[in-house]
Amino acid sequence: MARAMNRLGVRPGLSRSDFKLVASGGFGDGCNSYTHSMAWFRNRLYVTTMRNNFALMRARLSIGLHSWPVETPADPFELDMRAEIWAYDPLEDTWNRVFKAPMIIGSHGKPIARDISFRSITVFQSPGDPHPCLYVGTWCPARGPGPLILRSEDGIHFEPTCEPGLVGLPVTTIRALVPFKGRMYTTPAGSRGGNTNVSGHAVIYESRDPAHGGWEPVSDFGFGDVENKSLHEICAFGDHLYVGTLNNNGFQLWRSTCTGPAPYEWEPILERGAWRGPLNQIALSLTPFKGALYIGTGIQGGGIDKQNDIGPGAAELMRVYPDKTWDLLVGTPRETPHGFKEPLSGRGPGFDKVFNGYFWRMCEHDGWLYMGTFEWSSVLAYVKRSKFTGAFGRVLGYVGPKNVLDYQSGFDLYRTQDGENWAPVTTNGMGNPYNMGLRTLESTPYGMFIGTANPWGPNIMPLDGDEFVFNPRGGCEVFFAPSTAQNR
């Protein structure tokens, strides 16, 4: 039976019981770690994957673990690193893998995956396109030629539209693809040194016809600030294109109408992490909702940036209005140049949960704003105890790592109608503690899809074991909830 609106004309929000699991175990391959992006195209849901995330982390990061949680070779590229694109037909309840990245010869003379992830996907119609097409931003290995933007007219055949590195830039990934005013905008990111977020070229690029390349820079490098290590996230809101940065002194938020001669005029809206400083290192997610732009923050590395000695710190949420005024919604009360700000929700960083290192993705659906987190407590059991001192170490020793994994771990998903009152949908990764993050949300005519980041596969080291075993709950997952008008 249809789920009726209440007397105020408000459609009820989704609850945990509304969601069903439609893909598990990394689409049958635990090496598929992240659902890195989603798009609705031709009555199907398209989901892109990133593979073997823990293997890549082991190769470039030292994070003080007494044993590595996932079985990985010394060289991650001994694994099949080729990213995939999957399509889901909700009427037939069927998945099909429509694309898998090809192998190429890397700069070291050996075969490697051309694409280890597809970090962005969107629907756009270029002037020469016969109809709206899929555009996909890739992530290439450091030994590859550079990232590409792929295009597909039919959702099956994907072809490059630009030279490697967009225009030959020294970057490794295309992080965002955003249509605005009939043009496409992107942010090249990543560097050859292995830093996936810091950009070798922190500039916004624009194309009026991305089917044929035509990319041109439309901003100064880092908006004129060398501390803006990447232009991390882009979002169209009203008459402006907004850009959030990664800055070790705290993110900045900029906007432009993208009119007049390039490079366009850009104006600053927020700085120094909305005056929280380094603990708001990145403007990680930007989403319009009911007349304001919502901003979720984070610290790279899931809430602890070992390279820059930032964190641990939990994420904050704020909103900015077109007149440049802003509210703190979830976070730490503080003085700012715009007066004293306290969280209107009454909740501290991370919704009072220190492990929520990212407010990673947001999505409006049926009049509600949904926000998912990255929650890192599942790693605690593998961290050397000497890393934890003081009260936190004592509490962890008392509770025990297995209890943390069983009862604490897994991403959170919250929803709100006004930005101030939030209700939890799940606080345990939809019942799977290995679902560390909610990486993607997509509102569709049929309902809402969510996709997870779950790098705990295929084989893991059990907390009480001494050899790797298969993890049936490892690998990314996708859940679906019908629109509330269709529920019950």
Model-derived regions: residue spans:
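Trp- and S/T/G-rich repeat-edge/linker motifs of beta-rich repeat architectures
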Residues: 2-33, 40, 44, 53-119, ...
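Conserved beta-propeller blade signature
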Residues: 44-48, 133-137, 183-187, 240-244, ...
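Calcium-coordinating acidic loop motifs
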Residues: 126-127
